[in-house]
Every structure is written in C-alpha cells, then in structure tokens.
Amino acid sequence: MKATFLYGAGDVRVETVPDPAIRFPTDAIVRTVRACVCGSDLHRYHSMPASTTPRSMGHELIAVVEEVGPEVTTVRPGDFVVAPFAWQDNTCAFCREGMQTACLHGGFYGTPEAAGLQAEFARIPQADGSLVVVPDVDPDAADESLLNSLLALSDVYLTGYHAAHMGRVGPGTTITVIGDGAVGLSAVLASRTLGAERIILMGRHRDRTDLGTDWGATEVVAE
C-alpha cells in the first residue's frame, strides 16, 4: 500500500509499505476513504530535524472496515466508520470520565504502537472504542461535501465541540471563542448547536470571522 512519511522539515514522501495486519484481537483493519492534514502535522512539517528514520503521518480518517480481530464486537467488515484522532478502549476509568486521550490502554497514531493514518489502509487498535459507525451512508456514492463534513468529525470539529462541552455551553449561555482558526470556528458551530444565546468570536482574519458569523457567532471582536 501507499503511505505518507515525514523525513524532516518540508520533506514528505509517499512510499510503498506492507499492508497492515491484525496484531491484537481488539484490532481492526480499515480501508481509507478520506484522510487529511492537521495543524499539528504542519508543526512537524516546518520544524522536524532531518532524519533517516521517518515519522508516519496522519491521525484523521474516515474509512471502511475490512477485517476485525476476534474480540471486536461493535464494528464489522463493510461498516463505514470515523476514526477519532486517538485510539482508546472507551471503558477504562479515564474514558468513562470523558478523558479518552488519557485512556489506560490507548495511544496516538504515528507512533511505534500505531502507524499514521495517511495511508491506503490502517490498523486501528482498540477498535470497539476507537471507531464510530456512520449508519446509512455509502461512501462510494456519498456527496463530496458530506464526506468532508464527516472527516471533520475525526479531529478538528471534535476539538471545538469538546471545548464547548467542557465549558458547559448550553441553552441561554454567553460564551467567548478566542481565535478564528479551524478549532475556534468549530467551537462557534458547536456552541450554536448546544444552544448558546450569545457567541462572541474574537479574531483577526475578516474572511474567517465572516464565516464564524455564518456559523452562529452573534458578535465579532476584531483585533
């Protein structure tokens, strides 16, 4: 399969590597439908020292399940799924408190434990806790805008939503979002969805704050 690797600042290569295989009974193998670039990828793209040992890239994915380990019960081959940016069992004490990135049995992609997701196929550890099934959508027939929206659920929108959720945004609340980047705009959208009455967006880019207004910001404070 083809997969993406970072060898140093500005040095991204697409290389042929072996297809992933089930390593643990809780794993799943998925076929990538869409993957994307995150701001955290760009940090390394601009700063990583040159190395002969590359870093596999990517942690945002929508995909179709190809194979599951014998202990996987919540997904099956053929399911269309979203893979959030970290993998977790979703049953440990931390996961039950909503802190999945601190999962006792979880981790992050692009590490020795789990390769990056900018690849044609990927191994997903702890598949029962790490994959979310998208019902009633055929990715081969779905509209491009729907696929792009679903891809946002793998990381950037979740980050903004989590901020709003942890900030107890709800009906009638007043909130301020500082920053008009992708996460900030996602927080605006999430806050509107959660019922905030007044959403103040602070930003310095007119095109982005205009988008924030379209997405639910009631006021903009420009820098």
Features from the language model and the residues they span:
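Short glycine/threonine/proline-enriched tight-turn/helix- or strand-capping micro-motif at secondary-structure
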Residues: D11-D19
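Cytochrome P450 core scaffold surrounding the K-helix E-X-X-R motif
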Residues: S40-Y45
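N-terminal Rossmann-fold NAD(P) dinucleotide-binding loop
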Residues: G184-L185
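NAD(P)H dinucleotide-binding glycine-rich loop of Rossmann-like/cofactor-binding domains
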Residues: T91-I178
